[in-house]
UniProtKB/Swiss-Prot annotation:
The lineage of its organism: Bacteria, Pseudomonadati, Pseudomonadota, Gammaproteobacteria, Alteromonadales. It holds the Pfam family THF_DHG_CYH_C. It comes from Shewanella oneidensis (strain ATCC 700550 / JCM 31522 / CIP 106686 / LMG 19005 / NCIMB 14063 / MR-1). The gene is folD. Belongs to the tetrahydrofolate dehydrogenase/cyclohydrolase family. Pathway: One-carbon metabolism; tetrahydrofolate interconversion. Homodimer. This is Bifunctional protein FolD. Catalyzes the oxidation of 5,10-methylenetetrahydrofolate to 5,10-methenyltetrahydrofolate and then the hydrolysis of 5,10-methenyltetrahydrofolate to 10-formyltetrahydrofolate. Gene3D superfamilies: Leucine Dehydrogenase, chain A, domain 1, NAD(P)-binding Rossmann-like Domain.
Length: 284
C-alpha cells in the first residue's frame, strides 16, 4: 500500500479562493471588509517568515491587514495597551500576536487580554473552553486546519482510535478536543507516556506535533492509518522534514500529509476563516 498524499497546499488555496469570493460579495453588498491586526515583537527570523506569510495571505483574500512590528525591548504594558486599542477598533475583527514572545512578556497575560471575539488564533481560555464544551466558536488554527484535511479524505472519523503525540496548548491539547468532537476515541501522548510504540501501532489516526525530526518510525504506523505530521524541522543540509519518518510511513498509511505542503498552509487558511467568522458572527 502506498498512501495518498493529503495536499494541504491545494486545499488551503481552495479555501483562500472561496474567502476571496465571500469578501467580494460582502463589498458588493455594502458590507465592511474584514480586518486582521498582526503583532510581532522582536526580530526572530522564523516568526518574521510566519508573520510575512499571514500578511500576504490576508491581502490575497482582500482583508485589511494591519502590521505592528515592535522592538524586543517593548514592555509588557506597551503591548497590552496596543491590544486594548485594537480591541476597541471597529475595523479590526481579529488580533494575532505572534508567539513566542520575549522572556519578559507573559504569554498567558497577552492571550487573555485579546477580546475572545477577536481571538482568531483560538488561544483565549473562553474559546478553548467552548471547544471543550462541544460548542466551538473561534477554534485553534492548526487543529482546525487538520480537521479540514481529515475531512478531505472522506474517511468517517466516528469510532476511530486516534493518537495525538504532543500535548502543547497550541496543537496537542486542542487537537485532542477536536478529535473527541469528531467521534474518535482519543489518546494524548507526551514525554511521560509509556509504550508509545504500542499505542501508535494500534491507532487508525495519528497526529504528531513534537518538533523532532523523524521522531516516529514509519514502521510503527498501522496499515491503512491516516498520518498527520505537524512537525516542520530544518536539517543541517537545509532540508525540511516532519516528525514522522515519511518514506516508510507512506508505505503503511492510507493517507499522509507531506512536509512541507501539508499542515502548514492550513494553519494560515484557518486563521483567515476565523477572521471572516469573527466579522460575520460578532461584528456585522
Amino acid at each position: 500500500m502506498t498512501a495518498q498524499i493529503i495536499d494541504g497546499k491545494a486545499i488551503a488555496q481552495s479555501i483562500r479562493t472561496q474567502l476571496r469570493e465571500q469578501v467580494t460579495a460582502r463589498k458588493e453588498a455594502g458590507q465592511r471588509v474584514p480586518g486582521l491586526a498582526v503583532i510581532l515583537v522582536g526580530a526572530d527570523p522564523a516568526s518574521q517568515v510566519y508573520v510575512g506569510s499571514k500578511r500576504k495571505a490576508c491581502e490575497e483574500v482582500g482583508f485589511i491587514s494591519r502590521s505592528y512590528d515592535l522592538d524586543t525591548s517593548c514592555s509588557e504594558a506597551e503591548l497590552l495597551a496596543l491590544i486594548d486599542q485594537l480591541n476597541d477598533d471597529p475595523s479590526i475583527d481579529g488580533i494575532l500576536v505572534q508567539l513566542p514572545l520575549p522572556a519578559h512578556i507573559e504569554d498567558s497575560k497577552v492571550i487573555e487580554r485579546i477580546r475572545p471575539d477577536k481571538d482568531v488564533d483560538g488561544f483565549h481560555p473562553y474559546n478553548v473552553g467552548r471547544l471543550a464544551q462541544r460548542i466551538p466558536v473561534l477554534r485553534s488554527c492548526t487543529p482546525m486546519g487538520i480537521m479540514t484535511l481529515i475531512k478531505s479524505t472522506g474517511v468517517d472519523t466516528y469510532g476511530l482510535d486516534a493518537v495525538v503525540v504532543g500535548a502543547s496548548n497550541i496543537v496537542g491539547r486542542p487537537m485532542t478536543l477536536e478529535l473527541l468532537l469528531a467521534g474518535c476515541t482519543t489518546t494524548t501522548c507526551h514525554r511521560f507516556t509509556k509504550n508509545l510504540e504500542q499505542k501508535i501501532r494500534q491507532a487508525d489516526l495519528v497526529v504528531v506535533a513534537v518538533g523532532k525530526p523523524g521522531f516516529i518510525p514509519g514502521e510503527w504506523i498501522k496499515p491503512g492509518a491516516i498520518v498527520i505530521d505537524v512537525g516542520i524541522n530544518r536539517l543541517e543540509n537545509g532540508t525540511l522534514v516532519g516528525d514522522v519518518q515519511y518514506e516508510t510511513a507512506a508505505q503503511n498509511a492510507s493517507f499522509i500529509t507531506p512536509v512541507p505542503g501539508g499542515v502548514g498552509p492550513m494553519t494560515i487558511a484557518s486563521l483567515l476563516e476565523n477572521t471572516l467568522y469573527a466579522a460575520e458572527q460578532y461584528h456585522d
